[in-house]
Each structure stands twice: as C-alpha cells, then as structure tokens.
Amino acid sequence: EFRRQGHLMIDFLADYYRKVENYPVRSQVSPGYLREILPESAPYNPESLETILQDVQTKIIPGITHWQSPNFFAYFPSSGSTAGFLGEMLSTGFNVVGFNWMVSPAATELENVVTDWFGKMLQLPKSFLFSGGGGGVLQGTTCEAILCTLVAARDKNLRQHGMDNIGKLVVYCSDQTHSALQKAAKIAGIDPKNFRAIETSKSSNFKLCPKRLESAILYDLQNGLIPLYLCATVGTTSSTTVDPLPALTEVAKKYKLWVHVDAAYAGSACICPEFRQYLDGVENADSFSLNAHKWFLTTLDCCCLWVRDPSALIKSLSTYPEFLKNNASETNKVVDYKDWQIMLSRRFRALKLWFVLRSYGVGQLREFIRGHVGMAKYFEGLVGMDNRFEVVAPRLFSMVCFRIKPSAMIGKNDEDEVNEINRKLLESVNDS
C-alpha cells in the first residue's frame, strides 16, 4: 500500500510540474478562504489518499503562490530540483533525529563531508573546514545561522568583560543588511539602542562604508560601549550589492569584532571562478553562511554555516543532560550537532545536498548559475535599450533593479511621484 501511494504522490507532483506554468503565479484567493471550505473538525474515520489529493487539487493549489513556476520572478529564488526532491524524500522516509553522533552516525558524518565539499568548491579558507580545525553545519535558515553566531560572539565577549555588561554590546551592519540580524539581536538580548544600521548611498552602490563603520565604532567606544559583531553581506536583498569585505574585516579585527559574512543568495554563485572575487576577505571573518535552498537546487530548508572556531558555538549552545550522555560524545572525537544549533532535534538535511552535489557535479552547477546570470544580463540589455527605463543599481548576479525613468514621466519630477508611478507598475505586474 505504501508503494502504491508513493506512486500516486509522484504522479501527482509530476502532473503539477507539467502544468505549473498554466497556473496564475500569485494565488487569487482572499484571506480566510480555506477555513470557509474545510470542515470545522478533523475526520473521525480515515480517508483515502485519493480523496485527500483531490482536495489538494481543488482547495490547496488555488491558494498556493507557485514559487517553482517559470513565471515567478519575486524575491530571491527558492530553487528545487529532482535530486533535491528525492534527497528530501529519502531523508523524510528515514525520519532519523540526528541530534548527536551516536543516534545516527551517518547523518552527522555526511554533514561533515558535504560541508567540507561545498567549502572547497567555494575556496573557503581551510580554517573553515573540518580538515582545518573549523567546520560546517546545516541550519534551517540564515536567521538561525546569524543568531547562533551572534550568541557565540556575545558569550565570548561577556566572559571577558563580565555578564553584567550585556547592555553595552553593540552590533553593526548596513541599512541594506537583511532583517534577520535585527531579529537575532533582539533574541540575543542586545539593547535595541545598540543596533547600528549604518546608512549607505547610491553613490557607493549601497555598500557598507568602512570609514563610516570605524567612525561608528569609535563613537561607541568613546561612550563606554563595547563593539561586538559586524554582519557584512555578499548579495544584499534590495540590490545584491557586495560589501567590501577586505576593508571591513580589517576595521573589525582592529577593534576585535566578530565578523559574520551573510551570502545567503549570492554565495552559491561563488563556486564559479569569475564570481569568487566577491568572497575575497572572507579569510578574515569568523563565520560565513549561504542558503543552498536559494540558488543551489536544494529544497528548503538548507542554510550552510561555516565557523572558524566551533568551540565558540559549542560553549554557548551545548547542553549535556543525563539522557544524552554517551561514550562517543565523551571521547570528544565526534561532532554533536545539537551543540551547533538552537534546537535539540534536527533533520537529515545533508542527504539532499549530497544528492544535489553528486547528481549535477560542480560543472553542471556552475553552468546552472551562469545560465541565470546570462538571462539577467540579457534582460538588463533590453532595459538599457528602452529609453523609458533605467537600471538603478549595478547588476552583479542574476537580479536586475530597474524603474521607469523620471524623464519618461511628463510633469512628474517629484521623487515621491516617481516612486508612486513605479509602485503602480509593480502592482500591475503582480496582478497580471
């Protein structure tokens, strides 16, 4: 019966992908639609898979925004692949809970291996790899990765300055940094007044300025505060700009800040030699993360985090109650990933990434990235040939930022009016 139902499910998904281009990309339903058409209570008696899938087709799919549609261009991609789906299926089927090495050695050791593989593809410094004293871990999202490293940085600093100084710790980023950092800072107990989102400008292509960073640090030091943590970005959400890592890390190290590099979207591109330059300076960072579920054909969720000093994470995140004690952990020769993350339980994420790496290989993965960049470059050229539009930020990867030119709007010279016209264009595209 399991085999029969499995075939039904694969056929259902295959049919969905065959037709996905025909669905409206954005769901057309109204808020609360589903509660109105589903029963008020769960069924008392079992229902067949056929009946359930029929409801998926008629009630669930109309409420889905189809992220895998070829017509979906919003946000960063959530790329999937056959290899990713199958790896996820196997992981779910095994249903192991790999919180430490003993409960599923293969889950832990495969994660060790694939994060080292991926790190080598990115030409990360050896100090970020298990083979060089560092190591990688697969988290759910960048939010988790940033929170874990921020907590590690916080505790390392407070062990030196005293726990009562948590209110003096300061976190730095640009006004283009992902909001994940702000959320992590709140959870980690950083005083909201000590969160520095340093202003960027169009003249610098919205990069974080090292001089402004140093000025902010000096100002805080003069006021008795303790600079703690810098988050630099490779591929910002708004424009995919790249912060100048070499100069920023030089400033940060001068004042003993923990440096995290968030490359959630654009990091995957750096497996291509022509994009690796954007990671120059990462050798001076303390941690680095990217989301394989964004641009690396790996299904959600799969955030890869590398750290130079795993002991900093472990000191902050480890717990060792009686029921978790075992001989393998006590040897200190194995990795217990529960001590590298927020949760205790964890999924076998490494399987799907392993499937992707093996099914496509480095060569095809590079061509996949280059294909997307090539399409973006082509679109950028089309925008450039139309005098009604302008590209407003340099295209570095596969995202193009453009708008209607103010000069194309008769009598519309006020910036607010220009923005409103462009907002209406955006809304009309999304409604189409």
Curated annotation (Swiss-Prot):
Belongs to the group II decarboxylase family. GO terms for molecular function: pyridoxal phosphate binding; tyrosine decarboxylase activity. Its EC number is 4.1.1.25. SUPFAM superfamilies: PLP-dependent transferases. It comes from Petroselinum crispum. The gene is TYRDC-1. Keywords: Decarboxylase, Lyase, Pyridoxal phosphate. The modification N6-(pyridoxal phosphate)lysine is found at K294. This is Tyrosine decarboxylase 1. Pfam families: Pyridoxal_deC. PROSITE patterns: DDC_GAD_HDC_YDC (PS00392). It is an enzyme of class 4 (lyase).
